[in-house]
Amino acid sequence: MRACLAVVLLTAAAALAGCGGPPVPDDATSRAQIVRAVLAWHRYQADGNGKAGCALLTKRARYAQGGADCARSIDRYASFSAPIRQALRDTKVDTVTITNDQATVVTHTIATKGGVTRKTPPATIPLRWEGGRWRVD
């Protein structure tokens, strides 16, 4: 009887451990991964690289970008004006806040319009740990 109980408990523990993919990494590792994901997201938008951009999004965010047409939606960003695409590439991360499997990043960039260069207002970007990596949500 004890052997059966042990097998049942071990099986249940193994099943629970497999739920949801790998656990969220430690804080320092998460911060580095989050910053990389956000900067890459903006770079792929600027480049109009839909395939790479969609790979950085959660399922929910991919659906919001057009679901099956997510890549095509982001590919269109390549038609933005050069100053807007450059502003996306120049994004800087100001703060990262992590709470369990969710994170919030505050960013800004520098934009030039009419010969005047200014810091943009902050933008808040949500992320979620999904499929073993931090993804823009």
Model-derived features: positions:
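Sec-dependent bacterial lipoprotein signal peptides
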Residues: M1-A17
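Short, low-complexity N-terminal intrinsically disordered segments enriched in polar/charged residues
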Residues: C4, G18-D47
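Residue-level detector of bioactive/disordered segments in secreted/extracellular proteins
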Residues: C4-A6, G21, L56, R72
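Short solvent-exposed beta->alpha transition segments
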Residues: R36, G50-I98
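Hydrophobic pocket/interface hotspot
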Residues: W41, G53, L127
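Short beta-strand segments enriched in hydrophobic/aromatic residues
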Residues: Q45, L57, T109-A111
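Exposed beta-sheet edge and beta->alpha loop/turn motif
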Residues: A82-D90, D94-D137
